[in-house]
Amino acid sequence: MTAWFALTQGRFRQAVEAAQRGRAVAQSSRVHVQLIAQEAKAKARLGEAGLTTLLASGKEMLDRLPYPDRPENHFKVDPAKWDYYAMDVHRIAGDDELATQYATTVIRDNTSPDGTELSPMRVSECRITLASWRRKATWNRPWNSAKPDSKHGRQSKSTS
């Protein structure tokens, strides 16, 4: 819990340290996997490298564990929740390509054949990630010469 509190309070260095201490105690468990995710999120916020390797170690450990009996439990990490964590880490780190790949996977895996969203909060955040990526992709196109018109608070074509 110390790592999670530090992470949510913006104390990222302390979150990394707490996650590493917790991982030393919670070896080969879902808690260990969740602490890897928290460490990765904190390191992404700090701009540190090595996130893909760290996430791969969490995925490998998760794959060795049996599927949780109650995946809806916040503290039980399952493969779908792990992909959501990975999406979040890559989004924070600015790796839009991987973030969008994970977001698409999470939406697919959390939507039933009849269209019911199994994890609405997760799906919503993934949609925000995809929308943000699309917005950036559109804004960065070479033909987009629109510049903010501060006088009118809108976009206008550049005349220069």
Locate the predicted segments by residue.
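Conserved binding/catalytic microenvironments
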Residues: M1-S160
